[in-house]
Structure formats: structure tokens, C-alpha cells
Regions:
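Short aromatic-hydrophobic micro-motifs that form the base-stacking/packing surface
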Residues: 147
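Conserved "HGTGT" condensation-loop signature of ketosynthase/thiolase-family condensing enzymes
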Residues: 1-117, 122-129, 137-143, 151-270
Length: 270
């Protein structure tokens, strides 16, 4: 099962980034006091997770695994601003408590009284992949259902800082939350079956990456020509001139597209 809160992102000309369209949280998070104490990203993530669970009994959830690249930015910014404004004295601890990255998974567990495995991954670009790998291992160990999701928010301050550092070249910044319910057995309306997952980081040549991809596919009984869709993190060419790292990354994607997956439909997502 899968739910997301950014089906129709707000692309208002007043904002330089995509902003998630949020649901009416009163319909999902009934406790008004709890809802008021939640920051925007916490409400977004908790609502998405609760919707994904649907009518599934909390006792059947074997774990809640969440992932985020940057965490609760609004609360983090609020706490740091208070720190500066009050010269490190008389600080309200609430923004700090709410800014911890495991808040969303913890709130879902508290609302439904789920006394099970609860983990949060903050590995920047590898956060969701790490959470998904953990969920798959929990399923292999015997868990029947694992709730796994990822969420990130974008703020004006964060956007300006990332833009000045050159981190948004060729990227259309955005935000959102997504949750998936992984099950050992297919339910009535399964979206897909996960056959395999592999991650590798560090500096690798195109040949090394190609070899690992080929071996990964072969372990799952597939060849490159069997892949119908190829999704990469390729950036816009016109936006990365002068950025050596991004040019190298794009050249690797292009090599894979032109040599390994010539028969695949290709698209990029960033």
C-alpha cells in the first residue's frame, strides 16, 4: 500500500521550489492538542503514515522505519534562531524536541500504541534506500508487515543556503512525504513486488558501476535488455556547466543509458 501527500505540488510563481499540497489534517489526526503541537513536516509525515496503514490492526505492524535527508527543518531553524536571539539563555526546549529526526515514527507509534521496532535513517541521499533495505531484512526475519516511509520539507532559508552553496544546480527543489506498507504476502491490491535492492557509494568508474549493475540483474534472473524503464538522477545539462562533480555524474548516467540500457524507456528524477 502507498499513500503520499504531494500528488499535486504547489508551483506558485511566488516560491522558487515545489511545495506539497497538504490534506485536511483534522480528518486524519483526530487529537487536536497533539495536532497543534506538531510542526508542518511532522503532521505531513504522520498523516501520510496513518493513511498508509489504513484499517490494518496495529498489532500486525512489525516495525515502523522512517527516513529523511534533512529532518525537521522548521523546528531546527526555530530553535537555532531562539538560541541566537536569547544569547543561549532561557530557551524553550519544545522546538528542539520536535526537531529530532525520529519524531514522525515515534508519533505514529504513540497514536496507535505500536510497541514494535522503530528506526529512523538520516543518510542524506541514501536515507530511503537504507530504510527500505532495513524493512526488507525485517521481512526476511519473519515480520509480516513493515511500515516504511520518507519525508523532507523545504523552507525559504534552506533553499537560499543550498542555492548559495551550489547544491541545487540542475535540480528543481521540492518536498513531500511517502509511506509504503511492505508485507510478506501479497494483499488484495498489491502495487508491486520488490525483487532486489543494492546500494554502493564512493568513487567508481563507469565500468565498475556497469559490472555491478549487470551482476545485480543476473542474480535476479534478468538482463539489461529486460529492463523496460530506467530512472536516473541525471541533472539538467544547461544548469551544471562548470560543476565538475555533476558533469562526471551525468557522464556516468549517459554511459549507462547509451551502452547498457539502449532498449529501455529513460527518464530522470531529482
Amino acid at each position: 500500500n502507498n499513500r503520499k501527500v504531494n500528488d499535486s505540488p504547489d508551483v506558485s510563481a511566488n516560491r522558487p521550489f515545489l511545495q506539497a499540497c497538504e490534506p485536511d489534517y483534522k480528518d486524519i489526526i483526530a487529537n487536536a492538542t497533539l495536532r497543534r503541537r506538531m510542526s508542518r513536516i511532522v503532521k505531513m509525515g504522520v498523516a501520510c503514515g496513518l493513511e498508509c496503514m489504513g484499517e490494518l490492526s496495529p498489532e500486525k505492524i512489525g516495525g515502523i522505519i522512517t527516513a529523511t535527508g534533512l529532518g525537521c527543518l522548521v523546528d531546527t531553524e526555530k530553535f537555532l534562531n531562539n538560541l541566537l536571539d536569547n544569547e543561549e539563555r532561557m530557551l524553550n526546549p519544545t522546538p528542539f524536541i520536535q526537531s529530532t529526526f525520529n519524531t514522525i515514527g515515534a508519533q505514529i507509534a504513540l497514536i496507535h500504541q505500536i510497541h514494535a521496532y522503530n528506526m529512523t535513517y538520516v543518510h542524506r541521499g541514501l536515507s530511503f534506500e537504507s530504510a527500505l533495505l532495513d524493512a526488507m531484512m525485517k521481512i526476511e526475519e519473519g515480520s509480516e508487515n513493515i511500515l516504511v516511509g520518507a519525508m523532507d520539507e523545504m523552507t525559504e532559508t534552506s533553499y537560499i543556503i543550498q542555492q548559495r552553496l551550489g547544491l541545487l544546480k540542475g535540480i528543481e527543489a521540492g518536498e513531500g512525504a511517502q509511506f509504503f506498507l511492505l508485507s510478506r504476502e501479497a494483499g488484495e491490491h498489491p502495487l508491486a513486488e520488490i525483487r532486489g535492492l543494492e546500494t554502493f557509494t564512493g568513487q567508481h568508474t563507469t565500468e565498475e558501476i556497469s559490472s555491478r549493475i549487470i551482476r545485480f540483474l543476473q542474480r535476479n534472473g534478468l538482463e539489461c535488455q529486460d529492463i523496460q524503464w530506467l530512472v536516473t538522477g541525471k541533472n539538467k545539462k544547461q544548469s551544471i556547466q562548470g560543476d565538475y562533480h555533476e558533469q562526471i555524474t551525468n557522464s556516468i548516467y549517459e554511459e549507462l543509458q547509451n551502452n547498457l540500457f539502449t532498449e529501455s524507456i529513460q527518464l530522470s528524477f531529482k
